[in-house]
Amino acid sequence: MSFLIDSSIMITSQILFFGFGWLFFMRQLFKDYEVRQYVVQVIFSVTFAFSCTMFELIIFEILGVLNSSSRYFHWKLNLCVILLILVFMVPFYIGYFIVSNIQLLHKQRLLFSCLLWLTFMYFFWKLGDPFPILSPKHGILSIEQLISRVGVIGVTLMALLSGFGAVNCPYTYMSYFLRNVTDTDILALERRLLQTMDMIISKKKRMAVARRTMFQRGDVQNKPSGLWGMLKSVTASAPGSENLTLIQQEVDALEELSRQLFLETADLYATKERIEYSKTFKGKYFNFLGYFFSIYCVWKIFMATINIVLDRVGKTDPVTRGIEITVNYLGIQFDVKFWSQHISFILVGIIIVTSIRGLLITLTKFFYAISSSKSSNVIVLLLAQIMGMYFVSSVLLIRMSMPPEYRTIITEVLGELQFNFYHRWFDVIFLVSALSSILFLYLAHKQAPEKHMAP
């Protein structure tokens, strides 16, 4: 009876998650498109529902909600479904919609979709060869084979985003990195833009006058037809007329310059607005957050470097370790185990909420940046694939943030994976991403003033 009640709770929560994913799809991703493929919408919503259910099961594990056997069953069921979606269903439909957009392959789209899926499976399976991600005793058809490979892709994605975010967040929030932009700088750049536009108009007038002169002399009517005529009209000019090709090249160069000047002007206006915003109370608050994240970024890079150099992975969750250090330093009586469980629950909850929110915001921006009416179905399926892999790998990494007694069922469900490898791999990719982001932002910040203030 308890199993039925527990299952009804899980099914109800999954329906709610599915509904939220459906609304997000309709209200955010596809609100500007008339053509909707319901199979894409269902796949996206189901992926979102089962991804959120994994985080729900982590919270239930900490709180002791549901029977232990029920939680284990739903862990297994949820993991099997999400892997079925990520490895079989989503890649197949991505290939199907890609082939459907190619007219030559439209009649044989099912065959070519299967070929694309088999190609994906080959490279997906070969992905596990270079990495020590499995215990040697696992069979080729075991569920651990799929989890391990999905985990590598997801952890790599998480580390790249985390490394860039750890550097970009303080760079964005802190007023220290803002360039000093004045009204004089903006006016000077606008003057250059107006001068460039005047030059473009002047040269286009010269081209129009030259074409009119050629027409009046009968050059247009008498010029040879065909390919040779086209080449001659471009490369040769009538006697007494302007060289239209040369003027057109100058116009193209000036138009490209005008586009750059326009973008630089808009950037200066945005920077000036940020300077004004930084003087407000909310701006000062975000400036403080920027300093906090700067410290966190330096600490994270330092710890990642130490972990890589010493080849170590923490055995104790960060909350318990931090409380133990504080208690030993202050020399006070404190129930470390009791409070570490409650604080870990709050920390895990914050990580889960911020992960879901941050990923949805990123997915929305990414979708609007690259989607079109023809590619939108493929893009949504790619986002569903990224989302599912991201959440599966989050479970792999969030395990270390939990006290040891709560890690047991996750370890049992995920199998005998090499968890230490994933944490070391995350540190390596995070460090590379963070250092690359620092170098990129440094060069961009150093070059920007020179570019804007050039005469």
Curated annotation (Swiss-Prot):
UniProt keywords, alphabetically: Glycoprotein, Golgi apparatus, Ion channel, Ion transport, Membrane, Protein transport, Transmembrane, Transmembrane helix, Transport, Voltage-gated channel
Known catalytic reactions: iodide(out) = iodide(in); chloride(in) = chloride(out); bromide(in) = bromide(out); fluoride(in) = fluoride(out)
Domain of life of the organism encoding this protein: Eukaryota
Keyword Protease: no
Broad class of where this protein is predominantly found: Golgi
Glycosylation site positions: 180
GO molecular function per UniProt: voltage-gated monoatomic anion channel activity
InterPro entries membership: ABA_GPCR_dom, Golgi_pH-regulator_cons_dom, GPHR/GTG
Subunit architecture: Homotrimer. Interacts with RABL3; the interaction stabilizes GPR89.
Function: Voltage-gated channel that enables the transfer of monoatomic anions such as iodide, chloride, bromide and fluoride which may function in counter-ion conductance and participates in Golgi acidification. Plays a role in lymphocyte development, probably by acting as a RABL3 effector in hematopoietic cells.
Family: Belongs to the Golgi pH regulator (TC 1.A.38) family.
Protein's name according to its UniProt entry: Golgi pH regulator
Taxonomic source organism: Mus musculus
